Amino acid sequence: MSFAVARMTKLKADNLVGIGNHDQRKTTNHSNEDIDVSHSHLNYDLVAGRTDNFKTDIEAYINENKASKRAVRKDAVLVNEWIITSDKDFFEQLDEAETRKYFETAKQYFADNYGDENIRYAVVHMDEKTPHMHMGIVPFDDDKKLSAKRIFNREALQRIQEELPQYLKENGFDVQRGNKNKERKNLSVPEYKAMREELKKIETEKQETQAKLADTKKQLDEIKPRDTKKIASKPTLMNKNKVTVDKSDLADLEQRAVTSDAYNFEKIHLEVENHSLRNDLSEAKGRNYELRKENERLQKLVGTLQGIIRNVDEFLHKKLGINLPEKWLERAGLKEPSKKAPESSQERSEGHHEELDGPSL
């Protein structure tokens, strides 16, 4: 049986630009090598039309619907993004319509519990190795108060991990919840890479085991009929639908089954963790873009102020024969700081008082 995977990340205003560009595929150069741009046209949004620009549209929705008249804090969590998926084998058994229904069913669970209108985007990516959905929920309570801490607290997260797989199963999808692990934490990039290398080794061992299993099956198929009859003649082996194995082999098979389940769940978890790391990268790129824009704006403002100061200095010189103090021009970046010999304590004191008497630029 496959696992239902649901993982949440918190997004603030600064994160929404980069995440929006990634989720909506607004950029052509992707750092994610798993993206196949030839399949990007297969992506879709289950609530299409609600959000075009993640940052401006979501902020507008919050401001229009929040109960309080006070401005939202700059560091407030505006969206809780859920990544919903399962393992690759699970989706290979579904057709396009069934895959869409899987994500629609998961979305409906959150709509029933957290408000359909609060789901501002539910983008399904079909252009990566495993289909998955990025679903953004504005954490409004019933009183339209914004509080991610209260809406998605620890109890709520545990409830979702229990209820969502059951909800999906009740709607026809053969999935179960992952292993309970209260000690699980988000992996750092080095930890993630190390874990991925370990999984590669496990995958190799798994392939070797499968090859041995195929070889063993071939040998079993070649067993002579007289050997089969000899076994079948035993009282305990009258049922031809059953086979016997040694106890040691049985224990080994049971252990491999447990290991396989743990391996599959850990593999899915790492795939989702990988998406989270890519989200972090997208957030950083978005933040970097905003900082560059802010820097450009400030540079233009500085240039404007320098022009005003320069005009004032020229006006005073032309009309009154005086100039602005050199310290003012130095502070405005219109003149290189003069190099002077070290001042005496009295000169420093006088200069200090002189500076306090005039306006500061």
UniProtKB/Swiss-Prot annotation:
GO biological process, one term: DNA recombination
Keywords: DNA-binding, Plasmid
Top-level taxonomic group: Bacteria
Region (Disordered): 331-361
Gene Ontology MF term list: DNA binding
Disulfide bonds: none
Binding-site positions, DNA: Y44, Y114
Pfam families in alphabetical order: Mob_Pre
InterPro entries according to UniProt: Mob_Pre
Membership in a protein family: Belongs to the plasmid mobilization pre family.
Name by which UniProt lists this protein: Plasmid recombination enzyme
Organism: Lentilactobacillus hilgardii
